[in-house]
Amino acid sequence: MAFNFNWSPLTADASFYKRARDLLTTALNKSPKPPIIVDDILVTEFNLGSVPPELEILEIGDLAEDRFRGIFKMTYSGDAFLTLKTRVQANPLNTYLYSKPSFTSPEPLAAASGLTIPLQITLSEIKLSAFIILVFSKQKGLTLVFRNDPLESLKVSSTFDSIQFVRDYLQRTIEGKLRNLMMDELPAIIHKLSLQLWCPEQMSKEDHEKTNEMDEQAVNPFASPPLDAVDAHGNLLDPIDISSIAVNGGAELQSLFSQKNLFRLGNLVNTQLTSSLFTPSVPEVIFRAKAGPVDKPEASSTTPLTTPSLVKSHSFHGTSTVYTFSDTSSQNNGQLPSRPSLVSLGSATTGLGLAASRNAKPYANRKKKTRVVNLRRKTDTAASSEMGDTMSDSASVQASESITMSDSIPEDPEEQPELTMSGSSRVRFGLGGERSALPQRPALRRDLFNPDEATASAEISQPQVARSTPEKETAAPVRTSENDKRSDSKRRGPRSETPSVILEQAWIMKMAGEIAKRVYDEKQRNPSFWDEREDSPPPAYEAQPTTAAS
């Protein structure tokens, strides 16, 4: 298969060369230039020569009347040349003679003043050899892609050929730049030139767009004063004053603003200070909403010093016992919460929720996944809920965390359940008769605990006996509790506590008494075991007496 490659029309078209020079000039000045070049690079002469390149077909992928795609091997060794002009800044002290190592010569070397020299470079004897992918279409032009570095060699001639080191430097620098130019910029240049030959309508469209861009002149708003100019205080200026300012200097002229524009800006600022939904439109202005440190809600909020509130609820036949570790009342008094509160709610809330006081969520009471392990047994829940059922109806259901009540606690003549702690850690309700059968003795070391809790426990320490028991047996505990209440109210003053708080304190003191009782019984049962703990230390830790030298 053979085809003709006509090279002569390209070498004879003057408009083709003119456009090629413009494209090459743009491509050479696009990339960053070396610091030695202080001016733009201009392509003054460009000629493709009379010798066409040699093409060898390796593969044809698509072939039709209006399109072609294939892979070629191209070799070129013709008479094409390219001439460039620019200006360089030479440093007379730096001679580029690398006869000495760089670490022995002082750097940088500079002259007192820069020396600018015009430079003309001619590229000739260009030899190319590369594998190219060629895609042609009458609608899209010619696309050329190099698969390898096409430049083999070229000759660089300049005005500094008489200086050997300058000639070598220019040869190395221009070869490196030309390789990058042919790999990156040359395919785009060839594509634009092919559009000019086969698709002139597309080129005319691009030229028209560039002409429109060049016709648009930038308007300087400060070049001429506004018609209704005002000074810094907002007062209108006379045309005579404006003309005098324009003649004397331009600094004050640029500081003049239009009264109409200032009025618009003033309305825009006022809309931000009020609740008006109307925002005036200012031409050529971009509106951007930016939240400052005052507008951000997180910046103004402070982190509470107390721990987050813990809410635990269990549901049992429509009733629930909620243990609430509250910090609202303690924060009002300026102190940390001292003890938990026991609240009986007649609701069917379930789940275990942990919610922070500052970031409370609406789903805080929802049951979560095994984040908190309940170590209590189910019997504790049933017992606590049954105790809440037997309480008096006079204590109304309260959902708030802190409840204020009077000092007097109404006593129910009905049977009052008693909390007992057995060895199996079960909560049971026993009668007064069973309690009287146990040996009565004071608890050991009651002064170790908080005096407030100890005093509060005395109010419930004596149980109430059923109606069937004699009144003589119940008279003494009742009097004792009443006397304790009077002395406690005189000593501590008025306070607000719910019966649930008192019951919980009594239960805590009950547990402490049982623990102390067990420790005491254990010591009485095996006193020798505890005496061994107080033995003298082993001999290894005793200080050895020093013997006098004989």
UniProtKB/Swiss-Prot annotation:
Record's compositionally biased regions (Polar residues): 391-407, 458-467
Annotated Basic residues bias: 364-376
GO MF annotation list: lipid binding
PROSITE patterns: SMP
UniProt biased composition (Basic and acidic residues): 481-495
Chain ranges passing through the membrane: none
InterPro entries in the record: Mdm34, SMP_LBD
Residues covered by the SMP-LTD domain: 1-208
Domain of life: Eukaryota
Membrane topology term: Multi-pass membrane protein
Ranges for region Disordered: 294-313, 358-505, 519-550
Cysteine pairings via disulfide bonds: none
UniProt keyword annotations, A-Z: Lipid transport, Lipid-binding, Membrane, Mitochondrion, Mitochondrion outer membrane, Transmembrane, Transmembrane beta strand, Transport
Compartment annotation: Mitochondrion outer membrane
Extent of Low complexity compositional bias: 300-310
Chief place where the protein resides: mitochondrion
GO cellular component, one term: cytoplasm
GO biological process: mitochondrial genome maintenance; mitochondrion organization; mitochondrion-endoplasmic reticulum membrane tethering; phospholipid transport
Subunit structure: Component of the ER-mitochondria encounter structure (ERMES) or MDM complex, composed of MMM1, MDM10, MDM12 and MDM34.
Domain notes: Lacks alpha-helical transmembrane segments, suggesting that it resides in the membrane via beta-sheet conformations similar to those predicted for other outer membrane proteins and porin.
Family: Belongs to the MDM34 family.
Protein name: Mitochondrial distribution and morphology protein 34
Annotated source species: Pyricularia oryzae (strain 70-15 / ATCC MYA-4617 / FGSC 8958)
Gene (name only): MDM34
